[in-house]
Design a protein with these regions (language model features):
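A structural signal for the principal folded core domain
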Residues: 1-576
Length: 576
């Protein structure tokens, strides 16, 4: 039977295809299939949870039975012994029976207590790994997410406008390089992010903790970066940064990614009621610049090159735009506001001007008493101008939810801005900087600063225009050159140079909202930090009492009253 009979039918057919999307090959198959064994266990457990539990029945007899029940949900973890120096994992068949590290020779287990009745080996150090395969399978088992896992097919129509990584040049290049992987739209594309933070607060003992997250790019923009779709794979514990040893920590994750790429895993699609082989690929990593040095260390070949497709990626690492923007703004506000100790226009900077630049009007003027006078620069505000800006920021108000209270970052006594978070700098750079400095700086200074504000505003737009990014690739170089004519050489560190690479990454990788660390990744890290602090507050007092009373340590006598409960047997006197 002929579907398109005439011109009217052809137009109608084209309209339906444009509205609903063309049918893909993965829809052609059995109308319905039974779930595989893993999916059936998952559905049976969900069904059992709906059944009323009688009074005489119990959920589980012991803790071991409860753990077995939870493992069916895909919430299990792997406990892996690791060398005390973080140089080797005891987790494969060849290394499980080893008792010492083959790299450094350190013992795997703690020394045995000969007086103990049970002689059980206790590892000196362990790590916990959360597998990603069961969680990816659950995205297809749940009817709330399974329909959205193939959304990325619908966002590739306009070649100049990119609203999602699926429409980017990097995604299309990957599909062209690996057509077999691209033929199955249900295959998963992932992004990996990590960043270090101190779980005990900024003013506590220095400690660096590195959570490793994965996000799923198959989902539409409104779901892609939500915290419920960001998976924690493991936490690299401190107290120091892992450095190049992070490759050892990532070994289980890389092996699982290789298995998902090579063989895949049988997964049940609850929407189409089909079993299929799901594969996954890691498109890129995301971190700030110090994290880039940790992830893609320059002293050896990093572990990501073990992935068979890693060499074919156009972008292997994404510079975090928000951190680049914050560092850029910090240099601007500290120099323009003449923040003592933070400004880039200090005495050493003026000496550099004398050595490397032909700007005699800014050179230090020596005096007879040995003190040099620093001439006023056109890019530095006077005290009265700084007072006006600080007062304006102090009284500035925004709509609810638009921005945080920037008044808390204003110090009226010292006339400086302090404690600005990444989101504060993001808003100040794009919205407030051109307004704040317009009446106080000359056009030769205010103009390039405004161009930088427009640059970051275009860069962080929800819809990336490829032609616009190509324009900014050339224009940002001119803007940096204009700034070099104004500010001293000390103003330009590595962060100012990194801005030149950001338009290319946006053009190739798509909108930066899917490739930066802020908001959702930091929310997940913040939740971890809050949980650690709550646990510390609950467990510290019992630990402190037990440690002081144990007698294992020499304790200052002044600590004993802190762990001694009040005495109820006290003398009572009558009062008048």
């Amino acid at each position: 039977m002929e579907f398109v009979r005439n011109e009217v039918d052809a137009l109608y057919h084209e309209m339906v295809v444009d509205a609903m999307g063309a049918q893909s090959e993965y829809n052609d198959g059995p109308m319905a299939e039974e779930p595989n064994s893993k999916a059936r266990e998952f559905y049976d457990l969900l069904h059992a949870a709906e059944v009323h539990i009688e009074d005489q029945e119990k959920v589980s007899q012991d803790f071991y039975s409860a753990k077995k029940m939870i493992n069916v949900l895909g919430l299990g973890y792997k406990k892996i012994d690791i060398c005390v120096n973080d140089c080797f994992l005891y987790y494969d068949e060849q290394s499980r029976n080893l008792t010492a590290c083959p790299v450094c020779g350190e013992s795997r287990y703690e020394p045995r207590n000969m007086s103990a009745i049970r002689q059980k080996d206790v590892p000196r150090k362990s790590l916990w790994y959360l597998p990603i395969t069961p969680r990816l399978q659950r995205l297809y088992m749940s009817r709330k997410t399974v329909e959205h896992m193939t959304w990325h097919l619908k966002c590739r129509e306009n070649a100049d406008e990119v609203i999602h990584p699926a429409g980017s040049e990097a995604w299309k290049h990957f599909d062209e390089t690996h057509p077999t992987f691209a033929d199955e739209p249900r295959n998963v594309r992932l992004g990996l992010c990590t960043d270090g933070f101190n779980p005990f607060g900024c003013f506590a003992t220095p400690y660096s903790c590195w959570p490793v997250f994965l996000t799923v790019y198959n989902l539409p923009p409104e779901l892609c970066m939500k915290s419920e779709h960001i998976f924690l794979t493991r936490i690299v514990a401190g107290p120091k940064s892992p450095g190049k040893k992070i490759d050892v920590m990532l070994r289980p994750l890389i092996d699982e990614l290789k298995e998902l790429w090579t063989n895949g895993v049988e997964t049940y699609d609850s929407f189409r009621q089909q079993n299929f082989i799901m594969k996954a690929a890691l498109l890129w990593t995301i971190s700030d610049f110090p994290g880039f040095g940790v992830f893609h260390n320059w002293v050896k070949r990093n572990i990501f090159w073990e992935l068979p497709y890693w060499k074919d990626l156009l972008i292997r690492h994404n510079l975090d735009v928000m951190h680049c923007e914050k560092n850029f703004l910090d240099n601007i506000k500290n120099t323009v506001m003449d923040d003592k100790g933070c400004t880039k226009d200090n005495t050493n900077a003026r000496l550099d001007l004398q050595l490397y630049c032909n700007r005699s009007e800014l050179e230090l003027i020596p005096q007879d008493d040995g003190i040099a006078i620093k001439p006023n620069a056109s890019y530095v505000l006077t005290r009265e101008q700084r007072a006006l800006i600080c007062q304006w920021l102090k009284e500035l108000r925004f709509l609810d939810g638009y921005a945080s209270n920037i008044a808390r970052c204003v110090n009226m006594q010292e006339l400086r801005l302090f404690g600005m978070k990444s989101r504060d700098c993001h808003m100040f750079m794009q919205r407030l900087l051109p307004i704040a400095f317009r009446d106080f700086l000359i056009d030769e200074v205010w103009g390039p600063l405004t161009e930088m504000s427009n640059f970051f505003r275009a860069l962080t737009a929800p819809i990336i225009q490829v032609s616009n990014m190509e324009m900014w690739e050339e224009k940002i170089v001119e803007t940096i050159c204009k700034l070099e004519k104004v500010f001293p050489p000390a103003f330009f560190d590595l962060m100012e140079h990194l801005a030149i690479h950001l338009p290319y990454e946006a053009k190739v990788g798509g909108p930066v909202q899917f490739r930066w660390m802020l908001f959702d990744y930091q929310v997940c890290s913040g939740l971890l930090e809050d949980q650690i602090q709550i646990k510390r507050q609950l467990e510290f007092i019992p630990w402190f009492k037990t440690t002081v009373h144990s007698g294992r340590y020499e304790v200052d006598s002044r600590l004993l009253p802190l762990v001694t409960d009040p005495v109820n047997n006290v003398r009572v006197y009558n009062g008048y």
